Amino acid sequence: MSLIIDKDGTISLYQGDSGELVVSGLDADKKYTVFFAIQDKDRNLIGEELQVSVTNSDTVTFILTPEYTDLLKVPKQKPYEIYFYGIKACEIDKHIENTMFIADTTYGDLNRIIVYPKKVKGT
């Protein structure tokens, strides 16, 4: 797995590689649907939002498949491309939605994904 998350929440990965993204800090006494989305620099959604429902747990894991990360293109003239991601936790019983802050971020901060071009085509 080549997905790396640094201390400020920036994700680095190779295009087309898989990885797991673990989100913690949920209230284990509540039911949630948690969403993960990636956008380009123009705020266009890349692929579909991923969603996971969880009950009685303070963590949820998103599986980033090779097909999903392959949507993150790196232009040939660039060594990498930057995308942005967001995570939202929605309480199922109360219809409350909260965008989650990653690491020490706050309003206006962007959660970055640095995507490097494929090294090997694979399957």
Give the residues covered by each predicted segment.
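Contiguous segments within soluble domain cores/interaction surfaces
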Residues: 1-123
